[in-house]
Amino acid sequence: MEVFVVPVLADEGFEGPTKEVFQTPHWFDVGIGSVNLYLNKATALTIFAALFVGVIFWLGFRRAKIIPRGIQNLCESAYDFVDLQIARGVIGEKGARYTPYLLVLFSFVLVSNVLAIIPAAQFPATSRIAVPMVLAVVTWVMFIYAGIKSNGAGAYFKEMIDPAPTAPLAIRLLLGPIEILSTLIVRPFTLAIRLFANMFAGHLLLLVFSLGADYLLPKPPFVFGVASLLVAIVLTAFELVIDALQAYIITILTAAYIGGAMAHGEHEVAPSEELAEHAPVGVPAAAHA
């Protein structure tokens, strides 16, 4: 579709956001053999988000003090949140080693998303599918690495191929391909699509109401223009919440995938052991059976 159009106003000359909003023009192109390198707004904002996150954490931790203030306080608060609520909260104590990656992932996605409502930028870098796909591939490599490191390559891939060795053969033949497909393809694919679709749709919705307000305000009755403007303002605030929520979701899903990969090979707890674990101190598990 060449142009996104609001049908109600199309006959009056109003056109919604065009595809150029997301397919930003190239600022310059450089050809190196068969490789064509270019820079556009989307690429520039992606680079800016990465540099911004790196500089903020460098400033926060380069001269760390016992009593944190300013940027150091912000960085330590972000680290504690990701470490306690996501890394250790989802994976467990062994998740602490993955806190740096989860922190960088959360911070980069958050900054990239928030660029959608920053004047002059007004474009979420994550609304281009390439960015979420790269993040998903890195996460895919990370949880495969975590599974191999925790269980060994042989045990990890063996359980992926045969996740239920005690089940009947027909079930095993069914579960094996499903587990392989889920781990190697579905997880990174859905991780990328979820982030891309939310940011694309949110930015598109903001543009429709913002352009609608710009089109309707000079035209009587002015109530429609004012209403469109108010909706655009409310959606901007709502978009900020969605930006933070999407950063949190992709980070916690990454932690869940890493934790699941590390848990491969662990057998279910026997009922008696589970009862003993949750029984009050001094009371035998058998008393609760």
UniProtKB/Swiss-Prot annotation:
Membrane-spanning parts: 41-61, 101-121, 129-149, 166-186, 189-209, 222-242, 244-264
Keyword flag Ion transport: yes
Xref: PROSITE patterns: ATPASE_A
InterPro entries: ATP_synth_F0_asu (IPR000568), ATP_synth_F0_asu_AS (IPR023011), ATP_synth_F0_asu_bact/mt (IPR045083), F0_ATP_A_sf (IPR035908)
Membrane topology term: Multi-pass membrane protein
NCBIfam families: ATP_synt_6_or_A (TIGR01131)
Entry protein name: ATP synthase subunit a
High-level lineage: Bacteria, Bacillati, Actinomycetota, Actinomycetes, Frankiales
